[in-house]
Amino acid sequence: MSHESLVLRGTMRAHTDWVTAIATPVDNSDMIVTSSRDKSIIVWSLTKDGPQYGVPRRRLTGHGHFVQDVVLSSDGMFALSGSWDGELRLWDLQAGTTARRFVGHTKDVLSVAFSADNRQIVSASRDKSIRLWNTLGECKYIIQDGDSHSDWVSCVRFSPNNLQPTIVSGSWDRTVKIWNLTNCKLRATLAGHTGYVNTTAVSPDGSLCASGGKDGVILLWDLAEGKKLYSLESGSIIHSLCFSPNRYWLCAATESSIKIWDLESKTIVDDLKVDLKQESEMSAEGTASGKNKVIYCTSLGWSADGSTLFSGYTDGLIRVWGIGRF
């Protein structure tokens, strides 16, 4: 029986600070978009040849502080970003310009998402609110106080399930909440974490939600039932989670490594660690900077076909892993 694992295919360098988010196109085209604490968003062209896996095609600037999140519209024409400057921006990728600014949050925006039809936008902030917007930049609804989170809202996602349109949010109040998108009412509060929640992910079919953060434990939830299914121990703070688009895998970026679980057997398929020596051998220029700094992964994104995992790190590099059979 052949065993699948991941190998380093190359790196992508242009950001000068933490890579905070990675957005991959639905059509699997040769581009990705990344955001960074260097206040910029980069549109990359994937060359896939040699150690430099992609080259920066365009740098989008305008945010006045760290860009914390970026997502792509399903047609790949627009990117949506959220920043510690308190704003969201919708970017026209053809023109390389800001098409809309979304102003309303009173503190840092930590997470943004597009609905499946791209007609709705949701954002989460350190102001403890979740805002629902249309693409014109008009705020349609604010989820705040009452049933809402009592601390920073670190992550927000739309479920791809159109039968029961929902928003999933994670917070520093240690809970995950499920919201009914049609009326923005709370459907369930998922409690179980013993530390703040950094990240949530929804499975491609919309049935599962995974959450993770400070306590190093990934909790898997049944979204329809609002029930906890099981937990996975990562052993370190979790910064990002993502489901594979075509395998029953969950990928976690932790402060020690990237861990990939097979959710059927609940075993670790792979544990990816940075090897600076290997990287300097791969690339002609070598890596002189940050020899002694602790480097860890802060963002993840699978290619649409599930063959390639993009990972963004605190040293500003994107490391690209490919699936191989061994």
From Swiss-Prot:
Tell me the superkingdom of the source.
Eukaryota
Where are the WD-type repeats located? 14-45, 62-92, 104-134, 148-180, 192-222, 233-262, 292-322
Output this protein's name: Small ribosomal subunit protein RACK1
Question: Which keywords does this Swiss-Prot/TrEMBL entry list?
Answer: Repeat, Ribonucleoprotein, Ribosomal protein, WD repeat
Alphabetized Pfam families for the sequence: WD40
Role played: May have a role in cell division.
Which terms does the record give in the GO molecular function aspect?
ribosome binding; translation regulator activity
SUPFAM superfamilies, alphabetically? WD40 repeat-like
Report the CDD domains cross-referenced here. Answer: WD40
The entry assigns this protein to a family as follows: Belongs to the WD repeat G protein beta family. Ribosomal protein RACK1 subfamily.
Q: Which InterPro entries match?
A: G-protein_beta_WD-40_rep (IPR020472), RACK1-like (IPR045223), WD40/YVTN_repeat-like_dom_sf (IPR015943), WD40_repeat_CS (IPR019775), WD40_repeat_dom_sf (IPR036322), WD40_rpt (IPR001680)
Q: Which GO terms describe its cellular component?
A: ribonucleoprotein complex; ribosome
Is DNA damage included in the keywords of this UniProt record? no
